[in-house]
């Protein structure tokens, strides 16, 4: 897409000026200006419209119809260049260079020079002038022909007429909107006249129409007076308006044809001839009168009159009316009358039958002295010639013949090709402004072949004759195809033909063409006043001898001078009539309507008589002149007569020969007649073409010589200019290059300056930021140094711990050797079981007797199981209420019952277990003191001592552990009491349960909302409702263990017996002691909501201890890393946080009591229950067999202080679903890959024996079911939440875990040392005294939270303060610190 490119960029002054003009025109801020918007500005530049249109076409490259700022600037540059030098060619080079001065615009300046016409024509050109009567008459006639009798003209018809004006559609639309006052879509006569008048003003580039007004003024509408024109009453006059001839010829750059047309088209409806018009007509007459004879013959006048494009009949009528002297020559008077009548006819006014009296009385004609009264008519009457004297005419409206010998070249013309019919011809006939204007200079000089040249100056409207050198006339450009040889029938016509060779030179000098198209004029009747034609005077010339071919304008050869003179006359007339306004009014006092009606006939007769008198007076005055001319004419006529006589004789001689041929050719004459006429026309055309070509050849020869001379001069000038241009171009390029370089350097320097400024600002900002960061980093470095020291100290402590644990590993190796020795002893003790077979047989017999009672008890157990489920739900609700700090209503009763039951249980347990109490206590004390478990226990006791009552992280969390403990104790109590299980006391169970939910101060435990275990439980148990129970369970276990260590130790076996029986018991006691040492603090394994398996296991301690013949590596696995698998945490059905039960303790208690073979129904129930809970790695059938074998050696356990809790509720184990859940739990735990599982020891012979004797045992011989449970606990606590090391020690104490410390989030840099988990055996409080080991690392939830925040870059003080503000909520404290950072 092409674009505007300035070789010389716009200067700052130009940019400011052009931007100002552009924004004034772009009122809507669209970035473009339309042609309609810039038209007033361009018109005010004073340049011609054609130049402005070329400027627009040059800058509007894509023909968009609008200009952007760049194109608008280019247009104003071109206007400035053209204002400085108007003759420059229109091209893109005008806007590429800078003009010497900016374009000047004046809104009151006319785009073209206007002629003043007279001194009184000082009117404001920006106002729309009033309509002249001439314009009203022209446009009224056009309306009548278009409307055809209708009162309005339809929009489509008016559009067709308007479009022929070749104005922009937008301009025509605005004119229509102004004229269609009622928006009806049709125009009445006044609206049509106004529209045509505005179109005429636009075409003439009148300043008032540069910007059409929004509303036409009222006085402009009032200037339209639609009075009918009366043509048969010559005394009725219409006053001249201020603009009698319009403004069509005022502002146009007129050509010869337009000036000539204006001479025939500018006539007012009045019949008075002004002095100015008379002067114009006289000037035309003088230009035609080359010989200065004072008269013009028909040979000159006929071609001139034909150029008016009136038909021949109308011209004959005008000739008849104007020829007041009744001769073949016109004087200035007759010529003025004929021209006046032609103008009237072209204006659409019907010609009268006689010359109006007002025309004859015009002062300009000089026929009458000035007299205001029309009654005083003393001038002699002149006979008015009638139309009867005119010879017969052949009306050829489209063709006019010219003499065949006419070889005079004519002036070239630029005429629009229009047809002779339709509204376009009417429009063009009425107003020559509708033709496209051709650019000419302000002054048009028309030259002819004489020494006179006619010059018309558009500025002052005056026509002058200047003496110039003779020049070759311009060639003909019109077609002469319509010319033919004319043979007149009258003697006068033949004399004219004879004189043609003499008149040819005159005809060549007087021919001209005109462009006006005449409208059709109806024929007129003969004049009512007839006169006798003089036989001695020549008749009216025949206008049919000249033809005008369709589509081409032809005339005789004097058009240059005549056209200029006619145009000057028309322009002068219009200016004179506008300036004189009311100078000439009708002086007839009787011109009013009534008087005119009465005197019309008398006036007509008087006018005729006056014409006759004037004609006779004139004839008398010119008799002498005519006498001399008559003599010459007689001589010429005589010669012509002789010539004709000779021709006549020749014709007579050939007449006889042609008579015979005439009869034969008469039939062909009619057919060939048309062909002859066509051939004659073609001959005339050929002759005309020949003469035109000859004249054109002469002209071209002259032009060629002139062109060659001018070409040589131009070449020389071009050479000089090219050299100058080359030098200037080189200089310009150098300057442009320098300007570009300088601008580039300026741009680069400015960009570098901006960049440097930005860089300096950024560097300063970075320096400030780095200063702040340095201070922060120094603070952080100090904190990190402090933290590094702390980590180093902790690392040293961990190294010490690792060394200590290495020493303990050595001790464990020694312990393993001892255990191997003990295993050997246990194998020896297996022989003792054979001694008990007989005893077991007896027990089986007794069991058969109690079978009936078992069935009854079984039914009761099922019922109690339902009650137990309800109690469990009730207890859960109570526990939730307790966790929320709500005490039940019967809290006091429950506490009292719990205390009584505890005392009773303690007494019974003491009475049963006092046999071996002393020996067991000694063994346990010795063993515990010598083992490495004591150190861990001492540590736990020290940490518990250090804890405060307000520690929300580590204690006083309500748990459900008391429930399980109560169940275990109750189960043992039920086993000891035999038939007492049939009627358990639920009230005692609730009291024991409530007692477990109280702390050592008797206050209900409040659950810690910020505990790391509660808030960060594993994913597998986060949604489990049993989580609060497991949290409560842990603290309850710890508190109960601390309170009851002394009582429990009294039931633990500890040393070897001397007798075989006691040796067997001692072996079992030693084996059980190992279990105690590994898991003394894990009180229970809550595999299900009920305590079925645990109760069953506790009722058969002897059997559970029997298969414990394991190696040291199995019971105490070597130290290894703790691998936590999140996916395994949910492998079991109950992914709860559970503790183990103190089964080994109960087992040892029962081993200490003497063997009493007293089978009970409870033993049978728990035997079946154990079968439902297979140990890990064993099948149910294997467990069943082991249970049966173990039943032969079953003894009653010693009842401790918790034996009465939930007594008799073990019957719930009958439910198959619970057993299945427990079985699934043990299987899942076994499959979880626990590293703490004990190896299954098979004793096939013992199992078979127990099976055969139907021994009711409570524990399978394959493994201890309490061992796999810690693995579940270990997996469920693998959540990455920070849990206190103390909590883990308490939960997993005694399990032999090889990893003591959980991964610390806040201290990732501390190396993880393989430290075994601390074992927490149950020892007396007096044994827990020892040195406190400072771990040196964060182990509590608080310290872990502080350390985690410290690892995020905050100081310990900030972390501690934030945690205190947020109630030790790590997430809230983190957000608080980040927000306040």
UniProtKB/Swiss-Prot annotation:
Q: Which residues form the UBA domain?
A: 1338-1380
Q: Kindly list the positions at which Phosphoserine occurs in this protein.
A: 241, 244, 248-249, 265, 419, 495, 848, 931, 950, 964, 1008, 1012, 1020, 1069, 1087, 1093, 1095-1096, 1100, 1181, 1187, 1343
Please indicate which superkingdom the organism of origin belongs to. Eukaryota
Q: What is this protein called?
A: EH domain-containing and endocytosis protein 1
The taxonomic lineage of its organism, from the top, reads: Eukaryota, Fungi, Dikarya, Ascomycota, Saccharomycotina
**Skewed-composition ranges (Basic and acidic residues):** 905-919, 937-957, 1021-1036
Q: Which residues form a coiled coil?
A: 593-882
The effect of residue 56 to A is: Abnormal spatiotemporal behavior
Listed result of changing residue 176 to A: Abnormal spatiotemporal behavior
GO cellular component, as recorded: actin cortical patch; cellular bud neck; cellular bud tip; cytoplasm; mating projection tip; plasma membrane
InterPro entries from the UniProt entry? EF-hand-dom_pair, EF_Hand_1_Ca_BS, EF_hand_dom, EH_dom, UBA, UBA-like_sf
The listed locations are: Cytoplasm
What happens when you mutate residue 1374 to A? Enhanced ubiquitin-binding
**Organism per entry:** Saccharomyces cerevisiae (strain ATCC 204508 / S288c)
Record annotation: effect of changing residue 1352 to A: Reduced ubiquitin-binding
């Amino acid at each position: 897409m092409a674009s505007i490119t300035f070789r010389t960029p716009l200067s700052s002054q130009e940019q400011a000026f052009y931007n100002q003009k552009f924004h004034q025109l772009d009122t809507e801020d669209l970035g473009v200006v339309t042609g309609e918007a810039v038209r007033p500005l361009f018109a005010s530049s004073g340049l011609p419209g054609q130049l402005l249109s070329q400027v627009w076409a040059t800058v509007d490259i894509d023909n968009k119809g609008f200009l952007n700022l760049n194109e608008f600037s280019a247009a104003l540059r071109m206007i400035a260049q053209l204002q400085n030098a108007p003759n420059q060619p229109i091209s893109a080079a005008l806007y590429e260079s800078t003009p010497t001065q900016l374009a000047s615009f004046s809104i009151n300046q006319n785009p073209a020079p206007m002629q003043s016409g007279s001194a009184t024509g000082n009117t404001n050109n920006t106002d729309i002038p009033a309509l002249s009567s001439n314009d009203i008459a022209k446009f009224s006639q056009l309306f009548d022909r278009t409307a055809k009798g209708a009162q309005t003209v339809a929009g489509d018809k008016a559009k067709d007429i308007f479009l022929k004006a070749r104005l922009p559609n937008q301009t025509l639309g605005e004119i229509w909107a102004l004229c269609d006052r009622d928006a009806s879509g049709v125009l009445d006569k006044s609206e049509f006249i106004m529209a045509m008048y505005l179109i005429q003003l636009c075409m003439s580039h009148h300043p008032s129409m540069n910007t059409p007004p929004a509303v036409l003024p009222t006085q402009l509408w009032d200037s339209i007076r639609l009075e009918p024109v009366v043509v048969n009453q010559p005394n009725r006059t219409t006053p001249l308006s201020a603009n009698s001839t319009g403004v069509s010829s005022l502002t146009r750059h007129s050509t010869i044809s337009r000036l000539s047309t204006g001479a025939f088209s500018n006539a007012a409806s009045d019949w008075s001839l002004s002095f100015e018009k008379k002067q114009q007509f006289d000037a035309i007459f003088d230009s035609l009168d080359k010989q200065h004879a004072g008269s013009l013959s028909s040979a000159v006048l006929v071609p001139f009159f034909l150029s008016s494009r009136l038909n021949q009949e109308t011209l004959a009528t005008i000739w008849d009316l104007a020829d007041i002297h009744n001769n073949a020559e016109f004087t200035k008077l007759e010529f003025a009358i004929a021209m006046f009548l032609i103008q009237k006819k072209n204006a659409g006014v019907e010609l009268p039958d006689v010359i109006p009296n007002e025309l004859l009385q015009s002062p300009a004609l000089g026929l009458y002295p000035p007299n205001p009264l029309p009654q005083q008519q003393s001038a002699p009457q002149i006979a008015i010639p009638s139309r009867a004297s005119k010879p017969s005419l052949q009306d050829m409206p489209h063709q006019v013949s010219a003499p065949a010998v006419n070889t005079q070249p004519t002036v070239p013309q630029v005429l629009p090709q229009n047809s002779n019919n339709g509204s376009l011809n009417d429009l063009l006939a009425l107003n020559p402004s509708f033709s496209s204007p051709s650019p000419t200079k302000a002054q048009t000089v028309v030259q002819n072949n004489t020494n006179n040249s006619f010059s018309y100056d558009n500025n002052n409207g005056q026509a002058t004759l200047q003496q110039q050198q003779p020049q070759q006339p311009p060639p003909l450009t019109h077609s002469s195809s319509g010319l033919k040889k004319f043979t007149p029938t009258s003697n006068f016509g033949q004399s004219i033909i004879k004189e043609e060779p003499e008149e040819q030179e005159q005809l060549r000098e007087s021919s001209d063409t005109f462009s006006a198209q005449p409208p059709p004029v109806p024929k007129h009747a003969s004049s009512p006043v007839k006169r006798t034609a003089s036989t001695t005077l020549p008749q009216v010339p025949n206008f049919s001898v000249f033809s005008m071919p369709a589509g081409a304008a032809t005339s005789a050869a004097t058009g240059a001078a005549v056209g200029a003179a006619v145009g000057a006359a028309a322009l002068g007339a219009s200016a004179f009539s506008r300036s004189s306004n009311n100078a000439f009014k009708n002086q007839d006092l009787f011109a009013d309507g009534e008087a005119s009606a009465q005197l019309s006939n008398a006036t007509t007769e008087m006018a005729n008589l006056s014409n006759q008198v004037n004609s006779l007076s004139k004839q008398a005055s010119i008799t002498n002149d005519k006498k001399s001319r008559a003599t010459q004419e007689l001589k010429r006529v005589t010669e012509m007569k002789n010539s004709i006589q000779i021709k006549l004789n020749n014709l007579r001689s050939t007449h006889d020969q042609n008579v015979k041929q005439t009869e034969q050719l008469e039939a062909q004459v009619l057919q060939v007649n048309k062909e002859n006429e066509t051939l004659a026309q073609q001959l005339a055309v050929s002759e005309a073409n020949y003469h035109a070509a000859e004249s054109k050849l002469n002209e071209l020869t002259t032009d060629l010589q002139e062109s060659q001379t001018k070409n040589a001069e131009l070449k020389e000038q071009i050479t000089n200019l090219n050299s100058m241009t080359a030098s200037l171009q080189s200089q310009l390029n150098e300057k442009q290059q320098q300007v570009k370089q300088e601008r580039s350097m300026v741009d680069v320097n400015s960009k570098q300056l901006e960049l440097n400024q930005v860089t300096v600002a950024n560097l300063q900002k970075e320096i400030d930021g780095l200063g702040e960061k340095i201070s922060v980093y120094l603070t952080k470095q100090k904190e990190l140094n402090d933290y590094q020291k702390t980590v180093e100290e902790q690392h040293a402590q961990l190294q010490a711990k690792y060394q200590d644990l290495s020493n303990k590993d050595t001790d464990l190796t020694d312990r393993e050797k001892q255990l191997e020795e003990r295993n050997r002893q246990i194998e020896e003790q297996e022989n003792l079981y054979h001694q008990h077979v007989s005893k077991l047989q007896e027990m089986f017999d007794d069991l058969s007797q109690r079978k009936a009672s078992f069935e009854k008890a079984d039914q009761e157990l099922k019922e109690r199981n339902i009650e137990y489920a309800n109690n469990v739900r009730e207890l859960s609700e109570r526990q939730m209420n307790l966790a929320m700090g709500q005490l039940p209503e019967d809290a006091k009763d429950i506490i009292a019952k719990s205390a009584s039951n505890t005392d009773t249980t303690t007494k019974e347990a003491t009475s049963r277990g006092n046999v071996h109490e002393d020996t067991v206590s000694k063994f346990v004390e010795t063993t515990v003191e010598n083992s490495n478990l004591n150190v861990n226990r001492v540590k736990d006791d020290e940490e518990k001592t250090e804890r405060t009552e307000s520690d929300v992280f580590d204690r006083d969390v309500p748990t459900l552990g008391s429930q399980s403990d109560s169940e275990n104790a109750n189960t043992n109590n039920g086993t000891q009491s035999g038939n007492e299980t049939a009627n358990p006391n639920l009230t005692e169970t609730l009291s024991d349960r409530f007692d477990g939910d109280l702390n050592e101060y008797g206050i209900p435990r409040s659950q810690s909302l910020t505990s790391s275990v509660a808030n960060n439980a594993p994913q597998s148990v986060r949604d489990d409702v049993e989580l609060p129970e497991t949290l409560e369970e842990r603290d309850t276990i710890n508190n109960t263990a601390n309170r009851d260590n002394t009582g429990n130790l009294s039931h633990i076996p500890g040393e070897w017996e001397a007798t075989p029986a006691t040796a067997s018991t001692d072996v079992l006691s030693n084996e059980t002691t190992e279990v105690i040492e590994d898991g003394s603090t894990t009180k229970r394994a809550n595999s299900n909501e009920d305590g079925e398996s645990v109760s069953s296991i506790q009722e058969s301690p002897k059997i559970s201890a029997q298969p414990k013949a394991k190696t040291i590596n199995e019971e105490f696995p070597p130290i290894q890393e703790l691998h936590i698998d999140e996916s395994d945490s949910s492998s079991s059905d109950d992914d709860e946080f559970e503790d183990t039960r103190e089964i080994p303790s109960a087992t040892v208690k029962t081993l200490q009591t003497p063997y009493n073979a007293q089978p009970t129904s409870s033993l049978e129930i728990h035997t079946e229950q154990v079968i439902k809970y297979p140990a890990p790695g064993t099948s149910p059938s294997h467990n069943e067999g082991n249970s049966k074998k173990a039943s032969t050696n079953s003894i009653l356990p010693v009842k401790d202080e918790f034996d009465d809790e939930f007594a008799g509720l073990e019957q719930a184990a009958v439910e198959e679903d619970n057993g299945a859940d427990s079985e699934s739990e043990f299987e899942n735990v076994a499959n979880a890959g626990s590293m703490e599982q004990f190896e299954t020891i098979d004793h096939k012979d013992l199992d078979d024996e127990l099976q055969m004797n139907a021994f009711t045992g409570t524990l399978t011989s394959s493994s201890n079911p309490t061992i796999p449970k810690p693995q579940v606990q270990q997996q469920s606590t693998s959540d990455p939440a920070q849990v206190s090391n103390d909590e883990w020690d308490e939960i997993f104490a005694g399990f032999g875990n090889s990893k003591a410390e959980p991964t610390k989030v806040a201290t990732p840099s501390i190396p993880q040392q393989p430290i075994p988990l601390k074992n927490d055996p149950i020892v007396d409080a007096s044994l827990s005294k020892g040195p406190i080991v400072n771990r040196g690392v964060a182990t509590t939830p608080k310290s872990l939270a502080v350390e985690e925040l410290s690892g995020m870059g905050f100081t310990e003080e900030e972390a501690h303060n934030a945690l205190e503000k947020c109630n030790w909520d790590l997430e809230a404290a983190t957000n608080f610190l980040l927000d306040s950072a």
